[in-house]
């Protein structure tokens, strides 16, 4: 089944060119199907690029998904036209009275900023707390994972000396966990962060199920036992060129970034990078939608209750 997005959203043309089935709202409104309602809180600067990346992953599912885009506040954006934000993004006040099947909170380039210094930190905490009462399952990505762990477990920020950048090998820890269904024993995924997520630290301070780790990158995937909060510390949504663009950006700003690991053929930035994580990203999002959202959410979202959810043993 397709994703349902506004007819004029720029991502529509990009995804159609990739032969991805997009159903405009004008057509979807004529079908008697209860789609999953998924909200994306987009914290990334280049919002059009980011929304397209996440919509691509959400599209590869037999479930029909109705996607709405959320902005953190009404401050002007340096990288996204105001017209785009006004036309396609909602403010929190417009959605806080509703319930949603799923919420995705994207990463943000705030790895070296203390939580209390993030200009929208209090507002983000409000949204995360709201999600616990209004959303079946929330997916926290990269920086949002660190923010979510701070809110839910009061974990302090742990920062690496050098930025972690590249494509790393990961090992799954519980092949029978629903989120990992269909995963290979090892898989590749990109990272671009300063945050440090060690398996020992999470095991000591949380009751999370640690699902996948890397010897170099640490914990990649973890979830609460009721699957209502899922944490992804990397960027499965990244396009093949995203790490390259970040590397070139940092060079242009006078920084001395390390060449992303295991990314360029022969470790040469002059070579075109290859996306070796695409199938994993699609499977991760498909499993999240199916096992964490669809199989747990009530048919009537007006009957949403925290008591509806059970924890796996």
Swiss-Prot record:
Active site (UniProt): 142, 235, 237
A molecular function GO annotation: homoserine O-acetyltransferase activity
Subcellular location: Cytoplasm
Residues binding substrate: 163, 192, 249
InterPro entries (alphabetical): Class_I_gatase-like (IPR029062), HST_MetA (IPR005697), MetA_family (IPR033752)
UniProt keyword list: Acyltransferase, Amino-acid biosynthesis, Cytoplasm, Methionine biosynthesis, Transferase
E.C. number: 2.3.1.46
Xref: Pfam families: HTS
Pathway(s) it belongs to: Amino-acid biosynthesis; L-methionine biosynthesis via de novo pathway; O-succinyl-L-homoserine from L-homoserine: step 1/1
Site (described: Important for substrate specificity): 192
A single cellular component GO annotation: cytoplasm
Family annotation (HAMAP family): MetA_acyltransf (MF_00295)
Name assigned to this protein: Homoserine O-succinyltransferase
Species the sequence originates in: Vibrio atlanticus (strain LGP32) (Vibrio splendidus (strain Mel32))
Gene name linked to the record: metAS
